[in-house]
Protein backbone atom coordinates (compact mmCIF):
# COMPACT_ATOMS: atom_id res chain seq x y z
CA UNK A 1 0.00 0.00 0.00
CA UNK A 2 1.59 3.29 -1.13
CA UNK A 3 1.02 6.39 1.00
CA UNK A 4 0.35 9.46 -1.12
CA UNK A 5 -0.53 13.12 -0.52
CA UNK A 6 -2.31 14.48 2.54
CA UNK A 7 -6.03 14.70 1.87
CA UNK A 8 -7.19 16.34 5.09
CA UNK A 9 -5.66 17.57 8.35
CA UNK A 10 -7.95 17.52 11.38
CA UNK A 11 -7.33 18.63 14.95
CA UNK A 12 -5.60 15.39 15.96
CA UNK A 13 -5.34 13.23 12.83
CA UNK A 14 -4.09 13.55 9.27
CA UNK A 15 -5.69 11.63 6.39
CA UNK A 16 -3.64 10.46 3.41
CA UNK A 17 -4.60 9.06 0.04
CA UNK A 18 -3.19 5.71 -1.06
CA UNK A 19 -2.77 3.95 -4.40
CA UNK A 20 -6.12 2.23 -3.68
CA UNK A 21 -9.10 4.53 -4.35
CA UNK A 22 -11.08 2.72 -1.61
CA UNK A 23 -8.46 3.03 1.14
CA UNK A 24 -6.94 5.84 3.21
CA UNK A 25 -4.22 6.06 5.84
CA UNK A 26 -4.97 7.75 9.17
CA UNK A 27 -2.04 9.31 11.01
CA UNK A 28 -2.71 9.89 14.72
CA UNK A 29 -0.72 12.94 15.84
CA UNK A 30 0.26 14.06 19.35
CA UNK A 31 -1.87 17.20 18.97
CA UNK A 32 -4.46 17.53 21.71
CA UNK A 33 -7.22 20.11 21.34
CA UNK A 34 -10.16 21.42 23.33
CA UNK A 35 -12.93 23.98 22.92
CA UNK A 36 -13.36 23.42 19.16
CA UNK A 37 -9.63 23.73 18.50
CA UNK A 38 -9.10 26.97 20.41
CA UNK A 39 -6.57 25.27 22.70
CA UNK A 40 -3.99 22.89 21.23
CA UNK A 41 -1.00 21.23 22.92
CA UNK A 42 1.40 18.41 22.10
CA UNK A 43 1.28 15.38 24.41
CA UNK A 44 3.99 12.75 24.01
CA UNK A 45 2.79 9.24 23.09
CA UNK A 46 -0.80 10.37 22.49
CA UNK A 47 -0.85 9.51 18.78
CA UNK A 48 0.49 6.02 19.44
CA UNK A 49 -1.89 5.34 22.34
CA UNK A 50 -4.99 6.52 20.45
CA UNK A 51 -4.06 4.63 17.28
CA UNK A 52 -3.65 1.32 19.11
CA UNK A 53 -6.64 1.98 21.39
CA UNK A 54 -8.82 2.69 18.35
CA UNK A 55 -7.62 -0.47 16.59
CA UNK A 56 -8.48 -2.57 19.66
CA UNK A 57 -11.98 -1.09 20.02
CA UNK A 58 -12.79 -1.26 16.30
CA UNK A 59 -11.80 -4.93 16.21
CA UNK A 60 -14.06 -5.64 19.22
CA UNK A 61 -16.94 -3.90 17.43
CA UNK A 62 -16.31 -5.81 14.20
CA UNK A 63 -16.41 -9.06 16.20
CA UNK A 64 -19.84 -7.96 17.47
CA UNK A 65 -21.11 -7.48 13.91
CA UNK A 66 -20.74 -3.69 13.71
CA UNK A 67 -19.23 -2.57 10.37
CA UNK A 68 -16.28 -0.19 10.80
CA UNK A 69 -13.86 1.58 8.49
CA UNK A 70 -10.84 0.01 10.23
CA UNK A 71 -8.70 -2.41 8.21
CA UNK A 72 -5.37 -2.84 9.99
CA UNK A 73 -2.57 -1.17 11.93
CA UNK A 74 0.35 0.02 9.82
CA UNK A 75 2.62 1.21 12.64
CA UNK A 76 2.62 2.97 15.99
CA UNK A 77 0.81 6.05 14.67
CA UNK A 78 -0.87 4.89 11.45
CA UNK A 79 -3.68 2.60 10.36
CA UNK A 80 -5.33 1.66 7.07
CA UNK A 81 -9.05 2.40 6.74
CA UNK A 82 -11.81 2.26 4.17
CA UNK A 83 -12.56 5.54 2.39
CA UNK A 84 -16.04 6.59 3.49
CA UNK A 85 -18.37 9.27 2.22
CA UNK A 86 -18.79 10.86 5.65
CA UNK A 87 -22.12 12.09 7.00
CA UNK A 88 -21.47 15.44 8.79
CA UNK A 89 -23.38 14.45 11.92
CA UNK A 90 -22.06 13.35 15.31
CA UNK A 91 -24.10 10.75 17.19
CA UNK A 92 -23.75 11.07 20.97
CA UNK A 93 -24.88 8.39 23.41
CA UNK A 94 -24.99 9.30 27.11
CA UNK A 95 -25.23 6.87 30.01
CA UNK A 96 -24.44 9.46 32.70
CA UNK A 97 -24.90 13.23 32.72
CA UNK A 98 -21.72 15.15 31.86
CA UNK A 99 -20.39 17.82 29.52
CA UNK A 100 -22.82 19.86 27.43
CA UNK A 101 -25.87 18.00 28.78
CA UNK A 102 -25.11 19.31 32.28
CA UNK A 103 -24.71 22.85 30.95
CA UNK A 104 -27.84 22.75 28.77
CA UNK A 105 -30.25 21.21 31.26
CA UNK A 106 -28.74 21.90 34.66
CA UNK A 107 -28.51 18.21 35.50
CA UNK A 108 -26.05 17.19 38.22
CA UNK A 109 -22.88 15.69 36.76
CA UNK A 110 -22.79 11.94 37.21
CA UNK A 111 -26.55 11.41 37.25
CA UNK A 112 -27.35 7.97 35.81
CA UNK A 113 -29.50 8.23 32.68
CA UNK A 114 -31.97 5.35 32.44
CA UNK A 115 -32.49 4.76 29.65
CA UNK A 116 -29.47 6.27 27.86
CA UNK A 117 -30.00 9.35 25.70
CA UNK A 118 -29.19 9.63 21.98
CA UNK A 119 -28.37 13.05 20.51
CA UNK A 120 -27.27 14.51 17.20
CA UNK A 121 -24.82 17.37 16.59
CA UNK A 122 -23.77 18.98 13.32
CA UNK A 123 -20.06 18.43 12.74
CA UNK A 124 -19.02 22.06 12.22
CA UNK A 125 -16.30 23.58 14.41
CA UNK A 126 -16.97 27.10 13.12
CA UNK A 127 -20.54 26.88 14.40
CA UNK A 128 -19.57 25.11 17.62
CA UNK A 129 -21.00 21.71 16.60
CA UNK A 130 -24.63 22.77 17.23
CA UNK A 131 -27.27 20.45 18.70
CA UNK A 132 -29.67 19.32 15.94
CA UNK A 133 -32.48 16.80 15.42
CA UNK A 134 -33.44 14.24 12.79
CA UNK A 135 -35.62 16.63 10.79
CA UNK A 136 -32.70 19.05 10.38
CA UNK A 137 -30.51 16.26 9.00
CA UNK A 138 -33.10 15.25 6.40
CA UNK A 139 -34.27 18.78 5.52
CA UNK A 140 -30.74 20.06 4.88
CA UNK A 141 -29.64 16.94 3.02
CA UNK A 142 -26.95 15.85 5.48
CA UNK A 143 -28.40 12.34 5.52
CA UNK A 144 -31.58 10.37 4.86
CA UNK A 145 -34.12 9.08 7.36
CA UNK A 146 -33.00 5.54 6.55
CA UNK A 147 -29.35 6.41 7.17
CA UNK A 148 -30.24 8.06 10.48
CA UNK A 149 -32.18 5.01 11.61
CA UNK A 150 -29.20 2.78 10.86
CA UNK A 151 -26.81 5.20 12.59
CA UNK A 152 -28.96 5.13 15.71
CA UNK A 153 -29.25 1.34 15.60
CA UNK A 154 -25.47 0.96 15.35
CA UNK A 155 -24.82 3.60 18.04
CA UNK A 156 -27.02 1.69 20.49
CA UNK A 157 -25.29 -1.57 19.62
CA UNK A 158 -21.89 0.08 20.18
CA UNK A 159 -23.14 1.23 23.58
CA UNK A 160 -24.25 -2.28 24.50
CA UNK A 161 -20.89 -3.80 23.51
CA UNK A 162 -18.63 -1.16 25.03
CA UNK A 163 -20.55 -0.58 28.25
CA UNK A 164 -19.85 -4.20 29.19
CA UNK A 165 -16.26 -4.08 27.93
CA UNK A 166 -15.43 -1.04 30.05
CA UNK A 167 -17.45 -2.28 33.03
CA UNK A 168 -15.36 -5.46 33.06
CA UNK A 169 -12.28 -3.19 33.24
CA UNK A 170 -13.67 -1.26 36.22
CA UNK A 171 -14.71 1.76 34.16
CA UNK A 172 -17.96 3.61 33.52
CA UNK A 173 -18.66 4.55 29.90
CA UNK A 174 -20.20 7.94 30.65
CA UNK A 175 -20.80 9.08 27.07
CA UNK A 176 -19.25 8.94 23.61
CA UNK A 177 -19.55 10.36 20.11
CA UNK A 178 -19.58 8.42 16.87
CA UNK A 179 -19.31 9.42 13.22
CA UNK A 180 -20.57 7.39 10.30
CA UNK A 181 -20.07 7.30 6.56
CA UNK A 182 -21.15 5.33 3.52
CA UNK A 183 -18.97 2.64 1.94
CA UNK A 184 -20.36 0.96 -1.19
CA UNK A 185 -23.90 1.83 -0.10
CA UNK A 186 -23.52 0.61 3.50
CA UNK A 187 -23.51 2.74 6.67
CA UNK A 188 -20.17 2.15 8.38
CA UNK A 189 -18.67 3.45 11.64
CA UNK A 190 -15.89 5.91 10.83
CA UNK A 191 -13.44 8.28 12.50
CA UNK A 192 -12.04 6.82 15.75
CA UNK A 193 -12.95 5.57 19.21
CA UNK A 194 -10.46 6.69 21.87
CA UNK A 195 -10.45 8.60 25.18
CA UNK A 196 -10.45 11.75 23.01
CA UNK A 197 -14.08 11.14 22.00
CA UNK A 198 -15.65 9.53 25.04
CA UNK A 199 -15.86 9.99 28.79
CA UNK A 200 -14.56 7.22 31.02
CA UNK A 201 -14.62 7.27 34.83
CA UNK A 202 -13.20 4.82 37.32
CA UNK A 203 -16.17 2.80 38.57
CA UNK A 204 -15.25 3.11 42.25
CA UNK A 205 -13.65 6.56 42.57
CA UNK A 206 -15.28 8.38 39.60
CA UNK A 207 -11.78 9.55 38.62
CA UNK A 208 -11.88 10.98 35.08
CA UNK A 209 -9.79 8.93 32.64
CA UNK A 210 -10.44 10.79 29.37
CA UNK A 211 -9.85 14.12 27.59
CA UNK A 212 -11.68 15.99 30.35
CA UNK A 213 -8.34 15.75 32.16
CA UNK A 214 -6.98 18.06 29.43
CA UNK A 215 -10.08 20.26 29.15
CA UNK A 216 -10.24 20.80 32.92
CA UNK A 217 -6.49 21.07 33.56
CA UNK A 218 -6.37 17.94 35.75
CA UNK A 219 -3.02 16.75 34.38
CA UNK A 220 -1.69 13.23 33.73
CA UNK A 221 -3.71 12.99 30.52
CA UNK A 222 -1.68 10.35 28.71
CA UNK A 223 -1.05 8.44 31.93
CA UNK A 224 -4.84 8.10 32.28
CA UNK A 225 -5.22 7.02 28.63
CA UNK A 226 -2.50 4.40 29.14
CA UNK A 227 -4.14 3.13 32.34
CA UNK A 228 -7.43 2.64 30.49
CA UNK A 229 -5.60 0.83 27.68
CA UNK A 230 -3.80 -1.41 30.16
CA UNK A 231 -7.04 -2.28 31.98
CA UNK A 232 -8.60 -3.31 28.66
CA UNK A 233 -5.57 -5.29 27.59
CA UNK A 234 -4.67 -3.03 24.65
CA UNK A 235 -1.11 -3.87 23.49
CA UNK A 236 0.79 -0.57 23.45
Swiss-Prot record:
GO terms for biological process: 'de novo' IMP biosynthetic process; cobalamin biosynthetic process. Pathway: Purine metabolism; IMP biosynthesis via de novo pathway; 5-amino-1-(5-phospho-D-ribosyl)imidazole-4-carboxamide from 5-amino-1-(5-phospho-D-ribosyl)imidazole-4-carboxylate: step 1/2. It comes from the Bacteria. The keyword Hydrolase does not apply. It catalyses: 5-amino-1-(5-phospho-D-ribosyl)imidazole-4-carboxylate + L-aspartate + ATP = (2S)-2-[5-amino-1-(5-phospho-beta-D-ribosyl)imidazole-4-carboxamido]succinate + ADP + phosphate + 2 H(+). One of its GO terms (molecular function) is phosphoribosylaminoimidazolesuccinocarboxamide synthase activity. Its EC number is 6.3.2.6. CDD domains: SAICAR_synt_PurC. InterPro entries: SAICAR_synt/ADE2_N (IPR028923), SAICAR_synt_PurC (IPR033934), SAICAR_synth (IPR001636), SAICAR_synthetase (IPR050089), SAICAR_synthetase_CS (IPR018236). Signal peptide: none annotated. This is Phosphoribosylaminoimidazole-succinocarboxamide synthase.
